[in-house]
Amino acid sequence: MEQYKQEFIEFMVESNVLTFGDFITKSGRRTPFFINTGNYKTGNQLNKLAKFYAKAIYDNFGDDFDILFGPAYKGIPLSVSVAMALDNIYGINAAYCSNRKEVKDHGDKGILLGAKLEEGDRVIIVEDVTTAGTSVYETMPILKSQAEVDVKGIIISVDRMERGKGDKSALTELKEKFGFKTCSIVTMEEVVEYLYKKNINGKVIIDDKMKDRINEYYKEYGVK
């Protein structure tokens, strides 16, 4: 596993973004782990997060893109900070673009923030975590309504590796539906592998009991 992936996993734990216990998801699933990206709150955290995204984007796409698109609302600060990180680390001067939930009728009018989309622009969608892919299904019509852009793919922080609407993961369903590349900084499989019996700040994050619970969860909800 790449060094930056290991560092990202520890970063999520230390930021209290990734926690283990007993939780209920929005869809009603009882899960032994929870990912709350709302706990990235400080400038330091966002700076580090953006660097992890930048490294994963470069690993998966190189410099084959022009614009980072961040779906509102969480994708807005992501697209901005990751664009800055790409410039700082790799010298890639990508633009950022996001959508508004409400269209403005004054000043900077329209549905988009940031760069104007033009025909042929190569776009990467930057998301936090996708379970059902809902925001992407909402994003694609917005992109196509603005210009005939070339969506190269989507990058998320963690692939939960759970079934979407059918027996496949949400990312796999998006790939099959739209034909673009789907990738993540890490997968939950990598997370569990790295954190099993791993001591962070004096605490073992995933012990045998938690590992068994995670395995049972994926027997029921994991991708086949």
From Swiss-Prot:
It holds the Pfam family Pribosyltran. Disulfide bonds: none annotated. GO terms for biological process: 'de novo' pyrimidine nucleobase biosynthetic process; 'de novo' UMP biosynthetic process; pyrimidine ribonucleoside biosynthetic process. It is an enzyme of class 2 (transferase). 5-phospho-alpha-D-ribose 1-diphosphate binds at residues 26, 73-74, 100-101, 104, 106, 127-135. It catalyses: orotidine 5'-phosphate + diphosphate = orotate + 5-phospho-alpha-D-ribose 1-diphosphate. InterPro entries: OPRT, Or_phspho_trans_dom, PRibTrfase_dom, PRTase-like. Its cofactor is Mg(2+). Its EC number is 2.4.2.10. Orotate binds at residues 131, 160. Keywords: Glycosyltransferase, Magnesium, Pyrimidine biosynthesis, Transferase. Pathway: Pyrimidine metabolism; UMP biosynthesis via de novo pathway; UMP from orotate: step 1/2. One of its GO terms (molecular function) is orotate phosphoribosyltransferase activity. GO terms for cellular component: cytoplasm. Homodimer. HAMAP family: PyrE. Catalyzes the transfer of a ribosyl phosphate group from 5-phosphoribose 1-diphosphate to orotate, leading to the formation of orotidine monophosphate (OMP). Belongs to the purine/pyrimidine phosphoribosyltransferase family. PyrE subfamily. This is Orotate phosphoribosyltransferase. It comes from Clostridium acetobutylicum (strain ATCC 824 / DSM 792 / JCM 1419 / IAM 19013 / LMG 5710 / NBRC 13948 / NRRL B-527 / VKM B-1787 / 2291 / W).
